[in-house]
């Protein structure tokens, strides 16, 4: 099986062309591929398939390293846009891709960064899904040893955003893993810790469900900015500074689409027998 390794700001992906290859992977296959000692290693596996709709260019299936299929991955979609151009699967600069959650539009810019129309953020608890009685800008969640104040939103996948004063002091893995499986989130949740530098700049660390702390996460960057704008803390254009690099996010609020722009990197092509 041919594959390509790419990364978006340190968030690394294995991308598989299922347009020109017949690909059938089990959860066991995916977990093996994700192993950084015995397989290839990745944060997410992205399988690019032919479209199911004539209005779409490609369909993409997204898997975490634990073998679970997920709805969305913003950084991964940017890499997919570059991948389909690199492999000459399309010559378009505006590419329509469907995922399990939605249909997104990716635009390859002149500087080879990729801008993604992520759609409008979803704050309705029923649609996130988030087991809470009614929508609020800030929620209180109870853990065995502490009380958490957070914002909750979906960008095609659920996100819990926690505002912090100093991001270096946060125990991302212990707190992230405790919140990931909180009973209020039936599909588990991605947990982000946001430090606001000013109204146009934030710092972010992310604990991704089924993965752990990662260098970057596109949907988490979008979710953090959406929550910050919704709470009146941020302007509509924000630079999100993650350990792996910076993503630009723009959102005019309400039901407007949110846009994320960032760079991608090709690493290598490979072949593996399964």
From Swiss-Prot:
Enzyme class: isomerase
Keyword annotations from UniProtKB, A to Z: Amino-acid biosynthesis, Cytoplasm, Isomerase, Lysine biosynthesis
Pfam families: DAP_epimerase
Catalytic activity, as annotated: (2S,6S)-2,6-diaminopimelate = meso-2,6-diaminopimelate
MF terms (GO), sorted A to Z: diaminopimelate epimerase activity
Source superkingdom: Bacteria
Annotated site location: Important for dimerization: 268
Signal peptide: none
Statement: the UniProt record of this protein carries the keyword Isomerase: yes
Protein localization: Cytoplasm
GO terms, biological process: lysine biosynthetic process via diaminopimelate
Enzyme Commission no: 5.1.1.7
Marked site (Could be important to modulate the pK values of the two catalytic cysteine residues) residue numbers: 159, 208
Pathway(s) it belongs to: Amino-acid biosynthesis; L-lysine biosynthesis via DAP pathway; DL-2,6-diaminopimelate from LL-2,6-diaminopimelate: step 1/1
Gene Ontology annotations for the cellular component aspect, listed alphabetically: cytosol
Active site, UniProt feature: 73 (proton donor), 217 (proton acceptor)
Predominant place of localization: cytoplasm
Positions that bind substrate: 11, 44, 64, 74-75, 157, 190, 208-209, 218-219
Gene3D superfamilies: Diaminopimelate Epimerase, Chain A, domain 1
PROSITE patterns in alphabetical order: DAP_EPIMERASE (PS01326)
Subunit structure: Homodimer.
NCBIfam families recorded: DapF
Function summary: Catalyzes the stereoinversion of LL-2,6-diaminopimelate (L,L-DAP) to meso-diaminopimelate (meso-DAP), a precursor of L-lysine and an essential component of the bacterial peptidoglycan.
Family classification: Belongs to the diaminopimelate epimerase family.
Name of the featured protein: Diaminopimelate epimerase
Gene transcribed to yield this protein: dapF
């Amino acid at each position: 099986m041919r594959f390509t390794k790419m990364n978006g700001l340190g968030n690394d992906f294995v991308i598989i062309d299922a347009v020109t290859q017949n690909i059938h992977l089990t959860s066991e296959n995916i977990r093996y591929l994700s192993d950084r000692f015995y397989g290839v290693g990745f944060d997410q596996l992205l399988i690019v398939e032919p479209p199911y709709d004539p209005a779409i260019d490609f369909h993409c299936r997204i898997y975490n390293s634990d073998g679970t299929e997920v709805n969305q991955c913003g950084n991964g979609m940017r890499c997919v846009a570059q991948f389909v151009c690199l492999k000459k699967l399309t010559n378009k600069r505006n590419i329509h891709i469907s995922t399990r959650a939605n249909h997104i539009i990716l635009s390859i810019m002149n500087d080879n960064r990729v801008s993604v129309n992520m759609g409008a953020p979803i704050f309705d608890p029923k649609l996130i899904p988030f087991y809470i009685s009614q929508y609020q800008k800030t929620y209180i969640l109870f853990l065995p040893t502490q009380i958490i104040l957070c914002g909750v939103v979906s960008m095609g996948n659920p996100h819990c955003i926690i505002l912090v004063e100093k991001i270096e002091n946060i125990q991302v893995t212990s707190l992230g893993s405790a919140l990931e499986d909180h009973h209020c989130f039936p599909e588990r949740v991605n947990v982000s810790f946001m430090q606001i530098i000013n109204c146009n700049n934030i710092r972010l660390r992310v604990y991704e469900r089924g993965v752990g702390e990662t260098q970057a996460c596109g949907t988490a960057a979008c979710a953090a900015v959406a929550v910050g704008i919704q709470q009146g803390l941020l302007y509509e254009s924000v630079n999100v500074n993650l350990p792996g690099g910076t993503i630009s996010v723009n959102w005019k609020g309400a039901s407007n689409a949110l846009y994320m722009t960032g760079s991608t990197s090709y690493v290598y092509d490979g072949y593996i027998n399964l």
